[in-house]
């Protein structure tokens, strides 16, 4: 079902299974918890077991970006069939490229943790609480998260974007791990990394380049596993 989140992000046939379960198997809502609408200090909370549209669509851009919460309201999954990069000449954004003029309050953000977008403004994601988690500042600005955003932006977009966010327990605000899959020019990869300063990690991110049949989800009879290699995080300039 829509709330049966896998342990890591998926690609290929497994992505299609997740997309259909999330988009076709549940009611998608438009809950806007952007800072410009609720205030940057309003301690709004996410609804549990909810699928929310988080793509910027005010200028009729057909973005289909969806966030999924679990039964305690943690943001655990984000999925998009196509990432449509922001066009600041045609879309309504601030002079900093934001769709919302203020960021919302994010529990546990601050003290070394940014209010980190799962899908950045530059990639068409809103500053919605359903698109934000407390992310270690260096990771968000210079680590794998920044690298992914920069790579997709320079490529002019991506397909089959899937993020899975892991927490130490069902009540925690701060994630322990992100796993993000996406395809550029037909080549898929999954980057899985801890929510910590990349300079403090020893092995770097785990990166896979899977094929279509690398994951097992309900309804699939697949047993292959992807080849995994350890690579040091690459750096990029922040948004």
Regions found by a protein language model. Give the residues of each.
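Domain-level detector of nuclease and nuclease-like folds
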Residues: 30, 37-38, 49-239
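Compositionally biased, low-complexity segments of secreted and virulence-associated proteins
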Residues: 1-42
């Amino acid at each position: 079902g829509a709330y049966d989140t896998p342990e890591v992000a998926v690609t290929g046939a497994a992505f299609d299974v997740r997309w259909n379960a999330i988009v076709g198997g549940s009611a998608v809502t438009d809950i806007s918890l952007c800072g410009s609408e609720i205030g940057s200090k309003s301690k709004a909370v996410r609804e549990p077991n909810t699928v929310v549209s988080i793509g910027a669509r005010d200028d009729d851009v057909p973005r289909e970006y969806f966030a999924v919460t679990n039964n305690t309201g943690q943001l655990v999954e984000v999925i998009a069939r196509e990432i449509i990069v922001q066009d600041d000449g045609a879309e309504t954004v601030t002079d900093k490229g934001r769709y919302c003029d203020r960021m919302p309050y994010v529990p546990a953000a601050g003290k070394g943790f940014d209010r980190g977008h799962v899908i950045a403004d530059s990639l068409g994601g809103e500053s919605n609480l359903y698109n934000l988690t407390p992310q270690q500042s260096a990771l968000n600005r210079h680590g794998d998260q920044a690298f992914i955003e920069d790579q997709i932006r320079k490529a002019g977009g991506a397909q089959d974007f899937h993020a899975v966010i892991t927490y130490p327990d069902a009540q925690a605000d701060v994630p322990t791990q992100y796993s993000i899959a996406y395809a550029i020019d037909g080549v898929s990869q999954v980057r899985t990394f801890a929510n910590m300063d990349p300079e403090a990690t020893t092995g770097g991110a785990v990166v896979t380049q899977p094929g279509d049949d690398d994951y097992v989800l309900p309804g699939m009879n697949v047993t292959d596993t992807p080849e995994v290699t350890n690579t040091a995080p690459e750096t990029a300039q922040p948004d």
